Amino acid sequence: MALALLRRGASPTDAQRRGRRRRWPIVVAVLAGVVTLAACATFETVDYYWQGAAGQIELLANSQPIPDVIGKSDAALAARLKRIHEIREFASRELGLPNNGSYTRYTDLGRAYVTWNVFATPELSLKPRQWCFPIAGCVNYRGYFREAQAAGESKRLKAAGDDVYVGGVPAYSTLGWFDDPVLSSFVSWPETEIARLIFHELAHQLIYVKSDSAFNESYATTVEEAGLARWLASRHDSQLDKLAARADHMRSVFRDLVRTTRTKLSEIYASNASDDDKRRAKHDIVAAMKAAYESAKQGDPALSGYDRWFAQQPNNAALAAVGLYTDRVPAFRELLHEANDDLPTFYRRVRELAARPKRQRDAALDALAQRAAASAMTAQRSGTRTN
């Protein structure tokens, strides 16, 4: 995930990266300038810009070089940071991801998440609201460095009649404009999940399309999947393989539940039924999803990892947030498959897609998804497996 307030329409050039550390003394002035540019906007908008700028400054100011942290940490944290260093080097060396200062420093947040993202949809629609910014373009969420501020925005949107979902974010990407640090919010995760996260966030630094969250997140999710497969192959650790397979299974069960629910809701919302009938159907469909989840947990208690998501009472906004990360993944997987699993070729073709107008880009992704579905059906019939 990329932070809306700080990202640009493209990643910085090599020359810009080399100048980053020289620019650090004026980072505060630069970010304050963002707030100044918003002076003609509403107080609410200015306040939003300010909390983002202040949060980023605090995050970077409190970071420390990982070697320094290792030297004064307990054995468990030191071991984790050393492993993260290996993952970071692997990302650039083997996956062709940016080689810069990101994930070479560590920040202890003192809280569970670095930001909280607020997603919203109309009551009877799965189309997420968008918020547009002069620098960042349009995104499908608003990010806050303080949970109370996210809760306040959630309350405001709910009062306007929207479905709202607030999700804690363990990490985000500034697309290479700053050296994104390793955060305490994810440092204790399993190795496989840390690898996924780092590969995902670095993928955002490599390619980013302004105002197309679904493209950006699905592309980065595909990179994290491909990266993890290569990381596991390099580790030769059967326990890690089992851990990754287990996590993949849980994701698959969860995503299938969400996909099925979204399909049913989409059909209802597109129908000629009255709004009251749509509301009743929505209630029943979401209740059925929750019941299916509880049933699945009885057969596999490990699925309880998604309890937090279900505890918020799933709604359109929660379902839409999941979709941003998964809807286009089959298309990008197919693109990687057609590139013979060669990442440089894949990146080149993703850039070609990114350069197209959105309508053409979406049409190309639809065609890729159709080819992926056809290949999967053929493989199923023949008893083989693709991708």
Residue spans of the language-model regions?
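Bacterial N-terminal signal peptides
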Residues: 28-37
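Pan-zinc metallopeptidase signature
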Residues: 256-387
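Solvent-exposed, acidic/flexible segments
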Residues: 59, 77-84, 143-150, 187-196, ...
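Acidic/histidine-rich, surface-exposed loop or edge segments in extracytoplasmic proteins
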Residues: 59-73, 131-139, 311-313, 330
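Acidic/His-rich structured neighborhood in mature extracellular/periplasmic domains
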Residues: 86-251
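Bacterial Sec signal peptide processing site at the extreme N-terminus
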Residues: 36-60
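Metalloprotease/metallohydrolase-associated module, dominated by Zn2+-dependent proteases
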Residues: 47, 59-60, 192, 217, ...
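Short, Lys/Arg-rich cytosolic juxtamembrane segment immediately N-terminal
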Residues: 14-24
